[in-house]
Structures are given as C-alpha cells and as structure tokens.
Regions:
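Active-site gating loop/helix substructures
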Residues: 2-101
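Non-catalytic peripheral regions of patatin-like phospholipases
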Residues: 31-39, 43-44, 74-194
C-alpha cells in the first residue's frame, strides 16, 4: 500500500485527522509527519489506508486502533500505547492544526497555509422532527448538538481569518448543504437530491 510520505503533489500537504483517546488529544497523520503533541511524532511512516481507517472509526460502531508505537519527542525516542479513533472526537473539521501561527510544540503537522479545505460529513440543518426523549436518542442528539456548535465556532474562526487576511480563503463542502442557497453554484454541481 501507499505510505503517507509517498503521497506527493507540488505544494500540497496531506493531513488526516484522528483522535488519541488515552490522552484526549488530536492525532494527525500526514505527509510531513504523524503523531500527537503528547507523544511526539511517529518514527515510522503510516499506510494511507490505515490513517483513513483510524480517522473514520466512528466510536459507536467501529473499534479504535490500539497499538504500541514508537515516537520521537525533543530528541528522545519512546514507545507508547496509542488508541486512535475518529478525528471528529477531538476536532471534527480537522482544521485546528492549520490555523496560522500555530506552535509546533503543541500540534503536529504545523505548516503555514493560505487556503484551507475541510469537508463535513454532517446531515445539514436539523428539520426538528427528532424526538430525543429516551436515553439513547438524547445522547445521540447531545453529541450532534455539540458537533454543530463546534462547527459554528470553527466556521466563524475561518471567516475571521479570511477577513483579517491571515488566509486567502477556505472551502467547506459538506453533505448536508442546501444547494439552492449556494451563492455561486458551479455549472457541473451534482445536487444533493440527485
């Protein structure tokens, strides 16, 4: 399989968002490096398929990736048990490591970027038909509400970064978008209802 560092396009860096559950930290797989600030960066490259699988392992349905991995941090090498799960647990949009002027002491894959592309696999605006009365449905809607609020905060941050010229722009495609409300729909848009 293809390794992350083997994914190369001119001036393009790949970052796949995940969450390390033991330390409750962001875990980033990337073409530059992989790891989390608590453990450091992995000493070995990772398969793209493994990074994608870890990033998409929704905790309610799929198991986390549980491995002993070797890291390097501040020149020291150590092995840590690492439990990696869905990126949305810690940073649902995966943009926190892309914010300008991040400190690499507290985040991996820190890079200066001027344009951010983040994809959202959400359902769009709730239609109000849900009746979360019993415990399981209340818990699901609670998580959905937390994610929606986190998205709103991140959307606001991206708009402020653009308005202050800290980034040139951003693109936020998402599955739940209202295609009829797009200000400039592309001519080859595949509509949500198709």
């Amino acid at each position: 399989g293809t390794l992350l560092k083997g994914v190369k396009r001119q001036n393009l860096k790949i970052i796949i968002n995940a969450s390390e559950l033991r330390t409750q930290s962001a875990f980033r797989y990337g073409s530059m490096e992989s790891g989390c600030w608590r453990f450091g960066t992995l000493t070995e490259d990772t398969l793209v398929a493994k990074a994608v699988a870890a990033s998409a392992s929704f905790p309610a349905i799929l198991p986390a990736l549980d491995e002993q991995q070797r890291y390097i941090k501040r020149g020291e090498t150590a092995t840590h048990r690492t439990i990696v799960s869905d990126g949305g647990v810690y940073d649902n949009l995966g943009t926190s490591c892309l914010i300008p002027k991040r400190d690499s002491s507290f985040s991996t894959n820190v890079t200066e970027t001027d344009f951010i592309i983040a994809c959202i696999a959400g359902q769009g605006i709730p239609d109000g038909s849900s009746l979360p009365y019993f415990w399981p449905s209340r818990m699901i809607e609670t998580i959905n509400t937390i994610h929606r609020r986190t998205h709103s905060i991140t959307f606001d941050l991206l708009h402020r970064l653009k308005e202050s010229d800290e980034i040139k722009g951003f693109l936020l495609p998402y599955l739940g978008q209202n295609d009829a409300a797009l200000p400039c729909p592309p001519p080859d848009l595949v509509a949500r209802d198709k």
